Amino acid sequence: MVKALLVGSKVLIPNVDESRYIYSNGFYGKAVGISKPKDPKDIIRPLELSLIESVYLAKKGLIKVIDKNGEVLEYEKLYEYSSKIINKFDIMYRVYEDLREKGFIVRSGVKYGADFAVYTLGPGLEHAPYVVIAVDIDEEITPHELLSFGRVSHSTRKRLVLALVDRKSESVRYIMFKWVKM
């Protein structure tokens, strides 16, 4: 199991060989100081993981996260810690996990004004075809919010997907928007 260190709101894999291994098994994380490596051998620095990626990898048994006191944070503890740091973590994590289980590569979508950028092949191999916004199915979305989501996805030439999470059943439903000229 790969050793990873919790540092605030990030998790670091200091060993470069272990970083390569994790990156090559699904494009997890980003190498410190290297943007969009095309090949795992391009990973020559430690790997930085988001909390969402770390929780997922811990649940899968691929990483062991250790805090500053040397305590191992099992999946449940790491999930609880992340919930305190990230707004709507439960919703975001549920969508992340669902997309990963469906075989997609899921990265942060912050620069696109979304929760996630989603790839079919991977970063560095293609531009992300989708931006995903995770929403509680019981949450109201105003027309203004919907239009602002759409503007960002349209200007970056990505398909906008709303991921609707039902907290009771833990199911995720997706709605994809297609913009047309009239």
Swiss-Prot record:
Its EC number is 4.6.1.16. Coiled coil: none annotated. InterPro entries: tRNA_endonuc-like_dom_sf, tRNA_intron_Endo_cat-like_sf, tRNA_intron_Endonuc_cat-like, tRNA_intron_Endonuc_N, tRNA_intron_Endonuc_N_sf, tRNA_splic, tRNA_splic_arch_short. The keyword Transport does not apply. Homotetramer; although the tetramer contains four active sites, only two participate in the cleavage. Therefore, it should be considered as a dimer of dimers. One of its GO terms (cellular component) is cytoplasm. GO terms for biological process: tRNA splicing, via endonucleolytic cleavage and ligation. CDD domains: tRNA-intron_lyase_C. Endonuclease that removes tRNA introns. Cleaves pre-tRNA at the 5'- and 3'-splice sites to release the intron. The products are an intron and two tRNA half-molecules bearing 2',3' cyclic phosphate and 5'-OH termini. Recognizes a pseudosymmetric substrate in which 2 bulged loops of 3 bases are separated by a stem of 4 bp. The gene is endA. The lineage of its organism: Archaea, Thermoproteota, Thermoprotei, Sulfolobales, Sulfolobaceae. It is an enzyme of class 4 (lyase). PANTHER family: TRNA-SPLICING ENDONUCLEASE SUBUNIT SEN2 (PTHR21227:SF0). This is tRNA-splicing endonuclease. Keywords: Lyase, tRNA processing. The active site is at Y119, H127, K158. It catalyses: pretRNA = a 3'-half-tRNA molecule with a 5'-OH end + a 5'-half-tRNA molecule with a 2',3'-cyclic phosphate end + an intron with a 2',3'-cyclic phosphate and a 5'-hydroxyl terminus. Belongs to the tRNA-intron endonuclease family. Archaeal short subfamily. It comes from Saccharolobus islandicus (strain Y.N.15.51 / Yellowstone #2). GO terms for molecular function: lyase activity; nucleic acid binding; tRNA-intron endonuclease activity.
